[in-house]
Amino acid sequence: NWEDEEYDDPKTIIDGAIEAQNNLLCGFYGNDKANKKKLDELKKPTNAAISLAGEPTLYPKIDELIGEFNRRDFTTFVVSNGQCVDRLRNLENDPYQLYLSLDAPNEKIFNTVCRPRINDAWINLNESLETLSSFNSRTCIRNTCVKGRNMENPEEYAKLIEKANPDYVEVKAYMCVGSSRDRLTPDNMPTFDEVTE
């Protein structure tokens, strides 16, 4: 069972992330054109985006991770696909902003676009949407528009967004980068006008 695996503790993760960022910056100190003051500022990060590498709420210590970032005066952003409803509901440490990805207006498109590996993924997402308004932090629905895949049925999106009652809605275009290129092409990238339509 994956929940029985060993995981790094939050302090180790944060210290490792800061160290990794500092390692990336070290080469810039040899550049005469680099702004040393800005480089020194970058060595002491103050923002953390907990996202991109899968579902962050799968990490069993996500609440403690957010709490440790908060103790270090970080502004913390968490991006979730809403699959670990109980973990979201049980957060005691609020991130500065909680994003919930909503990339389909209905279950059929959700199953095609998101390709969930669990049977109740659509139900989980909807439960997370219903939970979103209970957070004390800022909340945001994030929608990635994929041309030819999920840019339809705006009235269904509207109902889901109303259910969540977020502070913000962020609509953005899909970018053909990373492993998504294995299943999508540049033709799936909508233009700005198509996104705002």
Describe each PLM feature range.
Residues 1-12, 16-19:
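Canonical Radical SAM [4Fe-4S] cluster-binding loop centered on the CxxxCxxC motif
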